C-alpha cells in the first residue's frame, strides 16, 4: 500500500480512484494532480514506481487535505456558533441550517424521535 498524506491508499484500484480515499480530494482534484505530475490515471497503485509516489506526495501538499481541512471546517463552524448568528445557533441545536422545514421531516439532523406520553383525560 502506498501512503500519501498519512492515508493508506488501496493497492488494487486505479490511482485516479485511489486518490479520492484522501479526505479533501475528489475525482476532479485527483485528475488535476495526475495531469500535473504526468502519471497515467489508468495505472494501478501497486504498479506505481517510487518516483511517481514522491511526485504525487509533492502535488498533494499544495492542497489543504485530511486533518488540516477537518480542523479548518471545525473552526468555521465554531466561529459561526461563537458570533451567535442564526446558522451557528442552528448548528448548536442540531437543527437544519439551510431553511428546511422541521415540523415534519428533518429526522436525520434531529435524531430518533423522543416519544412523549399522551395527556390523560
Swiss-Prot record:
A Pfam short name: Ribosomal_S13
Keywords recorded for this protein, A-Z: Ribonucleoprotein, Ribosomal protein, RNA-binding, rRNA-binding, tRNA-binding
Compositionally skewed regions (Basic residues) per UniProt: 100-121
Gene3D superfamilies: 1.10.8.50, 30s ribosomal protein s13, domain 2
The UniProt record lists the keyword Ribonucleoprotein: yes
Keyword field contains Signal: no
Gene Ontology MF: a single term: rRNA binding
Region (Disordered), start-end ranges: 97-121
Coiled-coil portions: none
A single Gene Ontology CC term: cytosol
Gene Ontology biological process terms from the UniProt entry: translation
Domain of life: Bacteria
Family: Belongs to the universal ribosomal protein uS13 family.
Function in brief: Located at the top of the head of the 30S subunit, it contacts several helices of the 16S rRNA. In the 70S ribosome it contacts the 23S rRNA (bridge B1a) and protein L5 of the 50S subunit (bridge B1b), connecting the 2 subunits; these bridges are implicated in subunit movement. Contacts the tRNAs in the A and P-sites.
Assembly information from the UniProt record: Part of the 30S ribosomal subunit. Forms a loose heterodimer with protein S19. Forms two bridges to the 50S subunit in the 70S ribosome.
Protein's recorded name: Small ribosomal subunit protein uS13
Record organism: Synechococcus sp. (strain WH7803)
Name of the gene: rpsM
